[in-house]
Swiss-Prot record:
UniProt-recorded name of the protein: HTH-type transcriptional regulator Hpr
Keyword Repressor: yes
Residue intervals of the HTH marR-type domain: 12-156
Protein task: Negative regulator of protease production and sporulation.
DNA-binding region: 62-85
Top-rank lineage group of the source organism: Bacteria
InterPro entries, sorted: HTH_MarR-typ, HTH_tscrpt_reg_Hpr, MarR/SlyA-like, Tscrpt_reg_MarR-type_CS, WH-like_DNA-bd_sf, WH_DNA-bd_sf
Lineage: Bacteria, Bacillati, Bacillota, Bacilli, Bacillales
Subunit structure as annotated in this protein's UniProt entry: Homodimer.
GO molecular-function term, one example from the UniProt record: DNA-binding transcription factor activity
Record keyword Mitochondrion present: no
GO biological process, one term: sporulation resulting in formation of a cellular spore
SMART domains: HTH_MARR (SM00347)
Keywords: DNA-binding, Repressor, Sporulation, Transcription, Transcription regulation
Protein species of origin: Exiguobacterium sibiricum (strain DSM 17290 / CCUG 55495 / CIP 109462 / JCM 13490 / 255-15)
Length: 189
């Protein structure tokens, strides 16, 4: 049986088709799992992500939240404002930078984030469950290096540096900062 040689345009189209279909299918499950996880806390995905980013960065500018949360600046601002209205974070300006707006988690915001982390149930997470056979076969979960390389090219080194830092934080931060209840609860989950 002869195979047609794919020309660059066809190859690009086929590759793009695969990325679109696979990422859309994956995101549908990720989104459903994430919504179900945080629903009891009266949060949406953007709000939860803002709490997480603000915690991970020890406070952040709206621009940083937009960048690392992969959302428009107005989305980051509007959802941060809703969180401020609920008393979960505060807005401020820095003396050295009056142009940017910064957010910081309040103790209530830290507490709610901790509650969400403690409520995470891997057995209710579709992507996690679907990955278990790979973990059992290879002894570890997929590293996602191809996807990470693509995201690095799209969003830059600083995005991936924050991604690496927050990933490292989940596994190692409790050793350095055992007083951090959010990280401690992740290690126990």
């Amino acid at each position: 049986m002869e195979h047609e040689k794919l020309y660059p345009g066809q190859e690009a189209l086929l590759y793009s088709h695969k990325i679109v279909q696979l990422s859309k299918a994956l995101w549908k499950t990720v989104e459903k799992d994430w919504q179900n996880w945080i629903k009891p806390f009266d949060l949406n995905i953007n709000e939860h992500h803002i709490l997480w980013i603000s915690h991970a960065l020890g406070g952040a500018s709206i621009s940083e939240i937009a960048k690392y949360g992969v959302m428009h600046v107005s989305t980051a601002f509007n959802f941060s404002k809703k969180l401020e209205d609920r008393g979960l974070l505060t807005f401020s300006k820095k003396e050295t930078d009056k142009r940017n707006t910064y957010v910081q988690l309040t103790p209530e915001g830290e507490s709610l984030l901790l509650e969400t982390i403690q409520a995470f149930r891997p057995e209710e997470n579709g992507v996690f469950r679907a990955s278990l056979p790979l973990q059992e076969l290879y002894g570890k979960f997929p590293e996602l290096t191809d996807i990470s390389a693509i995201v690095r090219r799209l969003y830059g080194d600083s995005f991936m540096d924050i991604f690496a830092e927050t990933s490292k934080m989940i596994t190692e931060e409790a050793d350095r900062r055992p007083q951090d209840p959010v990280i401690d609860s992740i290690k126990k989950a």
